[in-house]
Design a protein with these regions (language model features):
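Pyridoxal 5′-phosphate
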Residues: 2-408
């Protein structure tokens, strides 16, 4: 139609905006430069990057340009450029996450992705599903709904905060499987503790029983390095506005090709070929500039390096975790083994409730966290980010030590 797809609108790459030869920078210098890419609130130390990762300025500037272009073209873009752009974006995202683009669709968040599967699965009366008490509430709610709607039995397990080994976790789920079990939902990373579960082993076990595995990877894409297909799960959902740091409202859903035909979409699509995954992602008109910016977020992460980011996030978590372990009245609710967590952790106090702890951290020390007080997890989730400094964590460490000595 004469106008090129929007992805070609701005020829300036993220790398050209940043102009940083990372190989010539000392590690501390590199992370100071990364910190400069963020507009940070001056009134508090942000240790709650779990809900939403704020978008770095290089990505944000591209997002604003995409908004301007979509607004300029209006309906022309929506009718003639949107679909080609979506294909390009999906292909790049699939390449990064390690799966075929024909098995991936862009959604708005993890809840949408996983609930599409839970609600769209062809349940029958008497079927059985398993998930954990530590799973995200929205998905637990959806399992409760299908239990009522289709008379499905649902069993909840409780994942230990400090497992002895992988086999303890695998056996926990295996012990609840029956001849009626159709699906296990499991967190790749438990959102309230940061614990990374042995997904490949869980999938291998479940598949021996003919049970499918739905993986909640809300906190994993852009957080640490892995391939979705190598997990051998049946379904995988994630939020891209978390650790990939896209603007709010971007997620993904992966479905193994053989399962696509049996899943009913939430909203009907004109695509009638049951083997096409695109039929699962119809939502009507939505903010397309967010989708477009996924490419820019991928470019920014490519500049940073996923291995380098993973190493930094794990370093930050271990920095405060090791400083607070074996301290009186302090409870660490996240495993210490390096492969069992990355950037997210959880710490509690025996002498103070989680809600009071979060309140005092904010009011007395200017530290923003979130209280967790359920499912055998009692503490504050601590989620630093690539912009977090060790000096900020020192403030947090000193604050927790001080609070552990209070009598309330």
């Amino acid at each position: 139609m004469g106008l090129s797809p929007i992805l070609n609108f701005d020829s300036t790459s993220v790398q050209e905006n940043i102009e940083l030869p990372k190989e010539t920078l000392h590690e501390d210098e590199f992370w100071q430069v990364v910190r400069s890419h963020y507009n940070l609130h001056p009134d508090f130390i942000n240790l709650e990057s779990g809900y939403y990762n704020i978008t770095p300025k290089p990505t944000l500037s591209k997002y604003f340009k995409h908004l301007e272009r979509v607004n300029l073209e209006g309906s022309f873009y929506m009718r003639y450029n949107r679909f080609e752009d979506k294909n390009i974006i999906t292909a790049q995202l699939a390449s990064f996450t390690g799966c075929d683009s024909k098995s991936l669709v862009i959604t708005r968040n993890t809840t949408e992705s996983l609930d599409l599967i839970i609600s769209g699965y062809p349940w029958k009366k008497g079927d059985h599903a398993i998930h954990a008490l530590q799973d995200y509430g929205a998905m637990q709610d959806m399992f409760e709904q299908i239990a009522k709607r289709y008379k499905v039995a649902v069993t909840k397990v409780s994942v230990p905060n400090h497992p002895i080994d992988d086999e303890e976790i695998v056996s926990l789920y295996e012990s609840q499987i029956t001849s009626k079990t159709r699906m296990i939902m499991v967190c790749h990373m438990i959102n309230i503790t940061g614990q990374i579960l042995p997904i490949r082993k869980i999938c291998a076990m479940a598949h021996r029983y003919g049970v499918e595995v739905l993986v909640d990877g809300a906190h994993c894409i852009g957080h640490f390095d892995f391939s979705i297909e190598e997990l051998n799960c049946d379904y995988y959902g994630s939020s891209l506005h978390k650790w990939l740091a896209t603007p709010l409202g971007a997620g993904l859903l992966y479905v193994k090709p053989e399962h696509i035909p049996k899943i009913w979409p939430l909203l009907a699509d004109e695509e009638q070929d049951p083997s096409k995954i695109k039929r699962l992602s119809h939502t009507g008109t939505h903010p397309v500039a967010t989708d477009i910016t996924i490419v820019d977020a991928l470019e920014y992460l490519s500049w940073m390096g996923i291995e380098r980011k993973e190493k930094r996030l794990r370093f930050l978590k271990e920095y405060w975790q090791n400083a607070l372990k074996n301290q009186e009245n302090i409870l660490i609710n996240t495993p210490f083994e390096r492969h069992r967590s990355c950037g997210i952790g959880n710490v509690g106090l025996k002498n103070i409730s989680p809600s009071k702890m979060a309140q005092l951290l904010y009011e007395k020390y200017g530290i923003f966290t979130v209280a967790i007080d359920y499912a055998n997890v009692h503490g504050c989730r601590i989620t630093p980010n690539v912009f977090t400094t060790t000096s900020e964590l020192d403030v947090f460490i000193d604050a927790v030590k001080s609070l552990s000595k209070l009598s309330i």
